Amino acid sequence: MGLAGPKKRTKISHDPNNIAWSRSTTGYGHRIMSAQGWTPGAFLGAPGAAHSSCYTAASASHIRVVLKDDTLGLGARPRNPLAEDEPTGLDAFQDLLGRLNGKSEVELVKEQRRREDIKLLSFVERRWKSMAFVPGGYLVKEDPARTLVVAEQANKDDSSDPKSRQETTQKRPKKEKRKEKSRHREEPIDSRSISSKPERGTINSANQTSDDESTNIVPSESKSRKKEKKKKSKKRKMDEVNEEESVPDGRIGCKGILPNKQSAQQSTGERYISGDSMINAREHRPLGRQVIRSRYIQQKKMALLDAKSLNEIFMTS
């Protein structure tokens, strides 16, 4: 509201820059000390004391008074060890009291280390307030007795079941046969056609062989293996479709429709695949503007991945 608003008035006693209280002679403390024989500018304490030679200008200045909220002594342990309201030099004073009381140097060193740890903890608490270290439990040691018991149980089971051993020995050759069949299936078609003589086979015969092999599989296989085989068969079909689309029309016929009359007369409704056509299908490359576009996209990706080039661009701009 500007000048029409309520004015904020502060008392002189609440002003931190006010030093009138130090010069006033009507205060309670000034009156008590003057009644005890103290005069302004004089030192505190007896004038003829043995330690009067240690008095300095600081002895005549104002002192700081801290009100205690407990009835503990000077060397007592505070309630909050992380509190920083301790007077300066109290740790040295505590060490001195400990030496006078007959404490050894080892105990004094331990107390000094404890104080340093407390100071570090207070610094960490002020710097990172919500930090808490929790053990993860990954380095837990296993009990050796428990492992021995498990090994003994396994040995007993093996000795008590000789029939299970025979069954496992019989199952091993079956598993090896299945692995050989799967390897034979996973071999690429072009390697077979190039290594051996160019054998011509129809797709129908290939489908029949795959069906025969699928019937020979033992029905006790797990569901996961069946799912994997289905996925593999789907991938093969997709690869065959992609190869048919990429191979030129003059080499492979599509569904019984062959481009040449001679090939149509030789094979009625059958599709023949040669090794050269498979090699050409695998070496499919874009032509024309697709080559330029793919190069441009590749250069753009490489430039974005390079951090140094990006920094240079930003620096120059």
Swiss-Prot record:
Residues 25-79 form the G-patch domain. The keyword Zinc-finger does not apply. InterPro entries: G_patch_dom, PINX1. It comes from the Eukaryota. Residues 154-170 have a biased composition (Basic and acidic residues). The keyword Nucleus applies. Keywords: Nucleus, Ribosome biogenesis, rRNA processing. Residues 152-268 are annotated as: Disordered. GO terms for cellular component: nucleolus. GO terms for biological process: rRNA processing. One of its GO terms (molecular function) is nucleic acid binding. It is found in: Nucleus, Nucleolus. Residues 192-219 have a biased composition (Polar residues). Residues 171-182, 224-236 have a biased composition (Basic residues). Belongs to the PINX1 family. Involved in rRNA-processing at A0, A1 and A2 sites and negatively regulates telomerase. This is Protein PXR1. It comes from Coccidioides immitis (strain RS). The gene is PXR1.
